[in-house]
Each structure stands twice: as structure tokens, then as C-alpha cells.
Amino acid sequence: MAKVYYEKDVTVNVLKEKKVAIIGYGSQGHAHAQNLRDNGFDVVVGLRKGKSWDKAKEDGFSVYTVAEAAKKADVVMILLPDELQPEVYEAEIAPNLQAGNSLVFAHGFNVHFDQVKPPVNVDVFLVAPKGPGHLVRRTFVEGGAVPALFAVYQDATGVATEKALSYADGIGATRAGVLETTFKEETETDLFGEQAVLCGGVTALVKAGFETLVDAGYQPELAYFECLHELKLIVDLMYEGGLENMRYSVSDTAQWGDFVSGPRVVTEDTKKAMDTVLAEIQDGTFARGWIAEHKAGRPNFHATNEKENEHEIEVVGRKLREMMPFVQPRVKAGVK
């Protein structure tokens, strides 16, 4: 079982006298920066010119270029998309790191897969809240917190663990609990969850269910409701209390169908396929493929995205959601 740390375990905050640079001011960046500042940390924000720069200035932060922020800081937290981090790190962060500095991440992908290679004289750790930035900020303001993971990759100073816990405490995570892990474990489990269950697995299951009903002659609108729209109701129940809560809350007919039909859909062959997915994450096959795809301009990514967006379930869903303004997305989907 994971070791969990709480506020009582952070007896001395070793970062309170240090300057922290938050690189990026998106979902996680704004939450980390504001929570740390509210807890008395000296925070600057490092960005390239754009809307985020203006937003960070409006929120009262001193904003610098990434290179300037990294040079000023003792602690550099990189909160940029995975695929952008290596270039920004090499060009703007690495040249400005000093011995004893801390290089911090919220996801271990680039360090674990050798896309970012820190110098041996800096501490390297991650602090990863298990929730989106708006929730990290909102719960903090309300006096609560989102749990987080932390891991130490490199301890150059002998106090990297203390620094990681101090950072986690600064964003409020120790109120809920901070679980100790490794860069390897955090990276591989995160990627597996996305691919086999949360994104890849769920979308494939939803489409397969929809197609099965439509191919059998049922109206696509009903197939959409039964296989996609109502998924939120079930996921919310699981989110609140696990599978047990979901099964308690649905009808007995639905629960019996769960017991007798679920294992026939997700079979031992499915688990074997999951094993293959995990193996490709572990041996770097997935990472190499994604890095190559990004460097090539993402031709397959964009082509697949365009094709998926025109699947019948999407066409039907757009029409049905016009009947339900209460489910309109907060952010309009578009080209990444």
C-alpha cells in the first residue's frame, strides 16, 4: 500500500524562503501559482507572450519569459503540455539552472522516457494533484484539497523529499493526503489508465455499443442515449462511492445484467490486450511512437481525430445536445 503524508508530516517547510517559478499558466499552472502564493510562497510565473501572460498579470503575478523566470527561481515547476516540455527545457530552462535548484513536474513522462535530462546537481521531483486545476484551486479556497502524488527522481541536496512535501503542502494537497510513488509508476499507470480505460477503452466501448444497436435496426438517437449520454450517471455514482455505490443505486435488473453480461464483453482476451498495451508503455514503444508522431507534425493524429469527429455517434450527439443546453461543453472542441 502507498505511504500517505499529511499536514502533520510537514514540520518544516523548506521552500518558504525560496523563489518558485511556475512555468505555464493553464489549468494546473494558475491553481499552483495562486495556492502557493496564498500560503506565503514567493511565486513568479514564466510564460511566452500571449493570453496567459495577460491573465497572470491580471491575477497579480510578476510575469517573465521562461528563461528569466528560471534564472530568478530556486524551484522551477514545469506545467506545460508533455510534447512542448523538451524544447522549452533545453532552450530556456536548462541554461539557467543552478546547483541545488529544484526541477519539478506534475507528470513523469519526459523524465522517465529521457526527453528531459536534468543535470546531476539539481533535485528532481514531481507533485501531481489527482484532479483538474479548477478543482485544485476551488477546494483549496474552500479549505479542502485534492489528493496528490509525489515522487523523487534525483536527490542532489539530500532534502528533495522534504522539498517535494513542502511543495505539496504549499498547494494544499497535504490537507487531503499525498501518496508517495516513483516517476516510473506514476508515468506508466497514468498512461495505462488513459489508454486502456479512461479514454481509449471507454470510447471504444461506447462506439461498439452504439454500433451494435444501430446495426440491429434500433434508432441511433436511442442508441446514443443508452450508450453515451447515460454514462455520466453511472460514472458519477462510481466516482462518489466506487462500484459498490453504483450497484446499490441502479435497479436490480441493471445490477444482474452487470453481473452476467459485463464479463462476456470485457473478457480474458480483453485483459490480454490490456497486458499488451501496458507492455508497450513499459518498454517505451508508445512514447517513441507519440514523440515521432509529434515531431512529424501529427499527420495520423489529425487524420484520426477528423475521422472520429464524423462518426455517426458524434453527428447524432450534436443534434441531440441541442435539445439539452444544460450539457453544453464548457470549452468548444476544436483542432489541437
From Swiss-Prot:
Pfam families: KARI_C, KARI_N. Residues 182-327 form the KARI C-terminal knotted domain. The active site is at residue 107. InterPro entries: 6-PGluconate_DH-like_C_sf, KARI, KARI_C, KARI_N, KARI_prok, NAD(P)-bd_dom_sf. Binds 2 magnesium ions per subunit. Involved in the biosynthesis of branched-chain amino acids (BCAA). Catalyzes an alkyl-migration followed by a ketol-acid reduction of (S)-2-acetolactate (S2AL) to yield (R)-2,3-dihydroxy-isovalerate. In the isomerase reaction, S2AL is rearranged via a Mg-dependent methyl migration to produce 3-hydroxy-3-methyl-2-ketobutyrate (HMKB). In the reductase reaction, this 2-ketoacid undergoes a metal-dependent reduction by NADPH to yield (R)-2,3-dihydroxy-isovalerate. This is Ketol-acid reductoisomerase (NADP(+)) 1. It comes from Bacillus thuringiensis subsp. konkukian (strain 97-27).
